[in-house]
Every structure is written in structure tokens, then in C-alpha cells.
């Protein structure tokens, strides 16, 4: 089952965290969920060239805090903060005057090992008619050079303008999708080519986390066995 399910959702509360952090009931839940979708879509469209990996939304009773993880914080902030202020004002109008909107920027130190950015980079190259094999091999090589324990990239669609759609993938290193303690990063992007849409998926293994001794089973000797009746 670990081969099919979304790796991030599969590892929630283990070594991954939610990207929407708030509580609601009834009709209020649907309203806030729709607001989250609109805000994420608007930020991604406005910051299309800023290499945005993920957007985390936290809500309190009268405030919304949005954390944007990006590899190019300078493009997000803009000259004297003009770009980020324009985005904040739009989101403020969306949430209403009674809700305070704050935006934080977090820089991604190693974009070469970020699964979402890798998938988007491969998709951009496919739109520029770069060979899918060359794009995938280059992304895998760079990620392994930057310290990833393993990476897998999968492209599906009319690759190379073929009449019949197919899927091609490359993998290097270890990518254990069924091991929950392994922090697998996952990203997805779409390349809109002349022959149709090509889906790009990326899995990155960012090193096994050390399991704490409290959660591990004791390795001491077993006690004497109870004799059978």
C-alpha cells in the first residue's frame, strides 16, 4: 500500500506535519477549506517564478498566518516589500477586515533535494522540449550529489510526442516508501506540452531519522520461559 498512497499523508504525525493547521465544525469547515484553496492558488500564481515549495496556513480565532517556503525569497519579498505587501492585501480582502493576515517567508537551503521543486523543474524542461530522459537523469544526479539518500522520478504521458502514452522512471539510492520512519519528500507537477499534459512525480529520501530509544524495543535478554502444562 505504501507504493500507491501519498507519502506525505501516509507519514502525518510520524515525521510529517499538516499544511493546514486549524479547527472548525459544520459549515465553517467548508468555508475555511475553500479559503485555503483560493489562497494557495493565488500565491502559486503570483509567485510562479519564485520556486515555492509549500505553503502552510495556520488559523487562530481572529488571525491567519501563512508561511511560504521558497528557494528565492528575494523575488517573493520584492523591492522594499512591494510584492509581499500586494499579496497580503489581497488575502486580507479575502479573509475580511476582522481577520489579521500575516505572511512569513522561509528560505529553502537546498532546493536541489526538494521534491516539489525537482518535479516543477523537470516539468519546465519538458515544456521547453528537452528530452525527458535527459531531464530526469540530470535531476537525479544533482540530488544525489547534494546529499539525498535516494530519489525516484516518474514521468507519464505522451513522452517524446509518442502516439501511445506510457510511463518512464529513474531511481537511484534507497527510496523505501513503506518504511514510515523514513522521511520521504514528495512532489507533483504537470508539463503542458503540444502533445498533451505530462505528469511528473518525484520522491526524495532525506536520510533516515534516528529512532528514539523510548520508542524502540528493549534489546536485553529475555526472561525464562514458563513451563508448559
Curated annotation (Swiss-Prot):
Keyword annotations from UniProtKB, A to Z: Ribonucleoprotein, Ribosomal protein, RNA-binding, rRNA-binding
Domain of life: Bacteria
Pfam families (UniProt xref): KH_2, Ribosomal_S3_C
Sequence segments annotated as region (Disordered): 210-229
Function: Binds the lower part of the 30S subunit head. Binds mRNA in the 70S ribosome, positioning it for translation.
Gene Ontology terms: cellular component: cytosolic small ribosomal subunit
GO molecular function terms noted in the UniProt entry: mRNA binding; rRNA binding; structural constituent of ribosome
Membrane-spanning segments: none
Protein name per UniProt: Small ribosomal subunit protein uS3
Quaternary data: Part of the 30S ribosomal subunit. Forms a tight complex with proteins S10 and S14.
A single BP term in Gene Ontology: translation
Family statement: Belongs to the universal ribosomal protein uS3 family.
Stretches assigned to the KH type-2 domain: 39-109
Amino acid at each position: 500500500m505504501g507504493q500507491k498512497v501519498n507519502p506525505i499523508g501516509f507519514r502525518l504525525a510520524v515525521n510529517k506535519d499538516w499544511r493546514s493547521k486549524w479547527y472548525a465544525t459544520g459549515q465553517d469547515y467548508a468555508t475555511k477549506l475553500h479559503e485555503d484553496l483560493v489562497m494557495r492558488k493565488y500565491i502559486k500564481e503570483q509567485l510562479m517564478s519564485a520556486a515555492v515549495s509549500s505553503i502552510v496556513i495556520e488559523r487562530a480565532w481572529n488571525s491567519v498566518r501563512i508561511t511560504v517556503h521558497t528557494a528565492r525569497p528575494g523575488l517573493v519579498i520584492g523591492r522594499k516589500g512591494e510584492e509581499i505587501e500586494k499579496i497580503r492585501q489581497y488575502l486580507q480582502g479575502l479573509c475580511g477586515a476582522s481577520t489579521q493576515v500575516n505572511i512569513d517567508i522561509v528560505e529553502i537551503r537546498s532546493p536541489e533535494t526538494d521534491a516539489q521543486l525537482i518535479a516543477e523543474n523537470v516539468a519546465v524542461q519538458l515544456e521547453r522540449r528537452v528530452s525527458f530522459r535527459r531531464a530526469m537523469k540530470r535531476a537525479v544526479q544533482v540530488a544525489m550529489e547534494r546529499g539525498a539518500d535516494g530519489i525516484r522520478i516518474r514521468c507519464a504521458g505522451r513522452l517524446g510526442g509518442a502516439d501511445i502514452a506510457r510511463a518512464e522512471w529513474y531511481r537511484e539510492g534507497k527510496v523505501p516508501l513503506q518504511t514510515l520512519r523514513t522521511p520521504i519528500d514528495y512532489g507533483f507537477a504537470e508539463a503542458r506540452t503540444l502533445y498533451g499534459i505530462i505528469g511528473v512525480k518525484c520522491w526524495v529520501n532525506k536520510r533516515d531519522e534516528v529512532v528514539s530509544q523510548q520508542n524502540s524495543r528493549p534489546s536485553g535478554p529475555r526472561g525464562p520461559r514458563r513451563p508448559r502444562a
